[in-house]
């Protein structure tokens, strides 16, 4: 159901006995900024807030910043609020500029472009083709539909160009998964629902899958997988592999095995600490301690099955 007029400060999820506030995505920021810029260009009036509908069915009332406009273009920004999610893009400004296009553009068509701080795709396996801006399919649709609706409301029979950019996006991107995914020069404009759910396990496992998919579509039949730093340090320091040789799966070993099957990989090699991997011997495919432990019990059981003495066990 749609929650009309609700503010993100009023939306929470409870995880691990904590009350965590939801946020909204860079895609939602891009849509809101584009809508506001279109309103200012078409109406020649400053806009302070816009109401947008997210794919999740939640309406947001977002503040518009850095506004300026002329008769030919309008520029503004929306500040990303990630809620209580530990997101390095929290607080960034996502800018949009809407300009009237020249005669070579079909009337009423929205041309979406990317500028500074928005990454470019350099490898196969992602939603966009090599060389294209890293603006995913859902945000592209959100931005285009929002601007097309304002064109229609204003009765304007001209095409427009929409430019999205993020100051400091290139620097921020170094702290994200983008370098490992083959996205260079900036962050991605993301979000299938338009909403950020704090501490989302699905968001993490989806990112792991995308990283494996990129490797598979760029010719990799086998993949190294590590839960964390123990495994990656061993591959780098002891075996001499590059630091990004392996996919980090955190505690989601079962999911990464499923991903490998889904992608028709020939095999994966798990590299990590015995304290993690001994759990796999008991079929524990999520290795987080809150899911299950039993490490000593697993050792004892397998020692018994191997014929170990009572004293040993």
Residue ranges and their predicted role:
Residues 8-181:
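Generic N-terminal targeting/processing segments that precede catalytic cores or assembly contacts
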Residues 9-14, 21, 27, 181-187, ...:
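A structural signal for small-residue-enriched, beta-sheet-centric alpha/beta enzyme cores
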Residues 1-7:
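N-terminal amphipathic/basic-hydrophobic helices that include classical n-h-c signal peptides
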């Amino acid at each position: 159901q749609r929650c009309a007029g609700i503010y993100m400060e009023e939306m929470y999820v409870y995880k691990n006995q904590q009350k965590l506030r939801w946020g909204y995505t860079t895609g939602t920021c891009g849509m809101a900024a584009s809508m506001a810029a279109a309103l200012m260009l078409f109406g020649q009036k400053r806009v302070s807030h816009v109401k947008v509908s997210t794919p999740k069915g939640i309406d947001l009332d977002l503040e518009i910043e850095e506004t300026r406009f002329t008769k030919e273009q309008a520029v503004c920004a929306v500040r990303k609020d990630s809620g209580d999610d530990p997101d390095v893009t929290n607080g960034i400004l996502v800018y949009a500029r809407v300009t009237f296009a020249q005669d070579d553009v079909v009337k009423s068509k929205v041309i979406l472009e990317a500028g500074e701080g928005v990454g470019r795709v350099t490898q196969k396996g992602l939603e966009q083709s090599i060389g294209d801006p890293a603006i995913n399919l859902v945000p592209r649709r959100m931005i285009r539909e929002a601007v097309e609706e304002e064109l229609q409301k204003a009765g304007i029979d001209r095409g427009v160009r929409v430019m999205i950019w993020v100051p400091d996006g290139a620097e921020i991107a170094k702290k994200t998964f983008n370098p490992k995914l083959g996205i260079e020069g900036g962050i991605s404009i993301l979000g299938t629902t338009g909403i950020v759910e704090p501490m989302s396990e699905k968001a993490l496992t989806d990112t792991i899958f995308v990283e494996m998919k990129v490797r598979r579509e760029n010719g990799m039949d086998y993949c190294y997988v590590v839960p964390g730093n123990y495994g990656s340090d061993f591959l780098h320091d002891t075996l001499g592999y590059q630091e990004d040789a392996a996919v980090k799966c955190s505690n989601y070993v079962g999911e990464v095995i499923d991903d490998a099957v889904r992608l028709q990989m020939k095999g994966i090699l798990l590299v990590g600490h015995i304290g993690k991997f001994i759990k796999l011997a008991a079929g524990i495919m999520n290795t987080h301690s809150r899911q299950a432990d039993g490490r000593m019990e697993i050792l004892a059981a397998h020692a018994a099955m191997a014929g170990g003495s009572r004293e040993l066990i």
